[in-house]
Structures are given as structure tokens and as C-alpha cells.
Amino acid sequence: MAIVGLGTDIVEIERISAHVARSGDKLAKRVLTEAEFEIYQQHSQPSRYLAKRFAAKEAAAKALGTGIGRGVSFQHIHIGNTPDGAPTIDFTEGAQQRLTLLNGVVGHISIADEKSYAIATVILESR
């Protein structure tokens, strides 16, 4: 296997909280898939959840080499969790097409947060 993409992003959680306070769920609906949005709505810390997902998707888009736009949408990247809580990443539509162009077959993701920041790193591998 070879690394075909690497991306990292960091988000200030308060910035996301302020946006949610100003605009309600507008950002969440733009960034999160339906399944992610359901979790967001019931989460004990929704702004923290949204910040982590935002960082994860930005990191994934950077690993794909496109950023958000140029055929890759936030909606084309789904961040989930294993039963043990480890984060997972799945690509659809434009993100999957870009991954295929890179000969990528698997994505690895790490997400962390502290009081003020959420950070994510994505590594894409080929076979």
C-alpha cells in the first residue's frame, strides 16, 4: 500500500458555537449527512460534534487534493464510528470519484478535541 493523500484541519470550537447561535442549524445542514445530522440533534454537545465533523471533512477534502468544491461536497464524505467509538470515513459521489482517480481504496481518520479546538487527520492509501 502507498499513501496517496494526506490532509489535516483544525477548527476553533467557539467559532462553530457562535455560528450555531447566530444561524441555528444552517451550517449543520450544509456540512452533515442525514445520519450525522440526526446524531447532532441529539448530541449533548452539538457544537463540539459539528466542529469535529467539519474538521474531519475538511481534512478529507484536503487529502483528496480538491478541498471542498471542485466536485467534492461535505455531503460526499460521511464520518461515522465503529461500535468501539473509533472514527470511520466513507466517500460517495464526487469524493469517491476523486478517491478512485488517486487509486485510493481506503481512508484512515483520527479526530481529537480539547477545550477550544477540534483537529482531524486523514490518510488515503492505495493497494
Swiss-Prot record:
Q: Which GO terms describe its molecular function?
A: holo-[acyl-carrier-protein] synthase activity; magnesium ion binding
- Keyword terms, alphabetized: Cytoplasm, Fatty acid biosynthesis, Fatty acid metabolism, Lipid biosynthesis, Lipid metabolism, Magnesium, Metal-binding, Transferase
Lineage top rank: taxon: Bacteria
Q: Which GO terms describe its cellular component?
A: cytoplasm
Q: What does this protein do?
A: Transfers the 4'-phosphopantetheine moiety from coenzyme A to a Ser of acyl-carrier-protein.
Q: Which family does it belong to?
A: Belongs to the P-Pant transferase superfamily. AcpS family.
Query: By what name is this protein known?
Result: Holo-[acyl-carrier-protein] synthase
As recorded in Swiss-Prot or TrEMBL, the protein's gene is named acpS
